[in-house]
């Protein structure tokens, strides 16, 4: 209820098919957003697929370096929030990767470059500036669209 459905037209889509989809969305009290398939795949790789892989990598880093009791004895909201996506069905993650690997790999490389840039920040002021830019952007996102509950 109230969800947004991102829809991509295909060459084979006719007006009857489109009408059925729109009626289903209306029955769910949701809204539709039509988006180009290529643009959709790029954005979804950042907003959905990449977070799953980052979450999984963080779990792998913790698992490979510490015993579970050590991690859980010290883990708090940050670890829980950052690794929540790792509970997702692995088959679904594999399917996401298989269908969008080109975009995922492109933005995974960009993400790795961001991490390397972060590691290179030696001056406190540089780090504060980097963090402030991210905080301001994320807060603006929340102000514009609100906070969604964690599920």
Mark where each language-model region is:
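Rossmann-fold dinucleotide-binding core
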Residues: 1-35, 41
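Substrate/ligand-engaging "lid" and interaction regions
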Residues: 32, 43-79, 83-84
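Short, amphipathic C-terminal "tail helix"
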Residues: 132-151
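An alpha-helix initiation/capping motif
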Residues: 37-44, 48, 128-132
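Interdomain hinge/lid region at the active-site interface
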Residues: 68-138
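Amphipathic alpha-helical interaction surfaces
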Residues: 53-56, 88, 117, 140, ...
């Amino acid at each position: 209820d109230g969800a947004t459905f991102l829809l991509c037209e295909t060459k084979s889509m006719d007006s009857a098919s489109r009408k059925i989809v729109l009626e289903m969305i209306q029955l769910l009290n949701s809204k539709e957003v039509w988006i180009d398939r290529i643009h959709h795949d790029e954005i979804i790789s950042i907003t959905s697929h990449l977070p799953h892989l980052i979450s999984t990598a963080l779990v792998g880093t913790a698992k490979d370096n510490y015993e579970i009791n050590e991690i859980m004895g010290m883990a708090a909201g940050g670890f829980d929030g950052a690794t929540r996506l790792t509970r997702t069905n692995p088959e679904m993650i594999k399917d996401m990767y298989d269908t969008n690997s080109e975009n995922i790999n492109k933005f995974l490389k960009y993400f790795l470059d961001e991490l390397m840039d972060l590691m290179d920040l030696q001056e406190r002021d540089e780090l504060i500036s980097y963090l402030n830019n991210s905080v301001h952007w994320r807060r603006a996102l929340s102000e514009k669209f609100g906070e969604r509950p964690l599920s």
